[in-house]
């Protein structure tokens, strides 16, 4: 086998094609995808490699192409608490959008993972200039945030379910009075 056929077999898609084909960005227009490509770099992570750490500066976001990433919380616990596992087609790292730009979770590759990384500083500038880009990203990232919040909520309830009292938090709730009738 000569070197030309080897290069053909392992040919990698151009970054612009990878951005355009990522499911998270489906339906975005050509101009928006071009701006996103301008902010993007390809990244690869080994199994068990920490990608980002909770509490550190959020400098961008990731779109997973292959592999799996565990999102974990370390805040207030002796060990990391798994929140959610994301894989191909998913986004993680939405904290770049909102001051103070601090990661809300730790992300760790569970297996070898390829992702597109988008630099926040450049992207925020583009979003300020092109509000349609900012709005498209906000709509998509908001949906991810809701899912992530629900996953964190469910996980915390699961962890603390044995400690949660089934009794009301206040021993005697105040009674509402309507005339002489107590409701």
Q: For each predicted feature, which ranges?
A:
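Cytosolic regulatory regions built on CNB/CRP/Popeye-like sensor folds
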Residues: 1-183
């Amino acid at each position: 086998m000569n070197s030309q056929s080897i290069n053909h077999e392992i040919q990698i898609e151009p970054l612009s094609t990878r951005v355009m084909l990522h499911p998270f960005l489906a339906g975005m227009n050509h101009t928006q995808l071009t701006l996103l490509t301008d902010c993007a770099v390809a990244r690869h992570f080994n199994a068990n490699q920490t990608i980002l750490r909770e509490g550190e500066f959020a400098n961008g976001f990731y779109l997973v192409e292959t592999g799996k990433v565990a999102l974990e919380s370390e805040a207030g616990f002796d060990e990391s608490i798994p929140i959610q596992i994301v894989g191909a087609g998913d986004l993680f790292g939405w904290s770049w959008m909102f001051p103070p730009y601090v990661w809300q979770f730790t992300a760790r590759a569970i297996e070898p993972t390829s992702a597109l990384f988008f630099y926040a500083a450049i992207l925020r500038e583009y979003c300020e200039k092109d509000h349609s880009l900012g709005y498209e990203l906000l709509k998509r990232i908001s949906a991810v945030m809701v899912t992530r919040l629900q996953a964190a909520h469910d996980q915390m309830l699961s962890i603390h379910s044995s400690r949660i009292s089934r009794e009301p938090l206040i021993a005697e709730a105040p009674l509402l009075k309507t005339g002489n009738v107590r409701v």
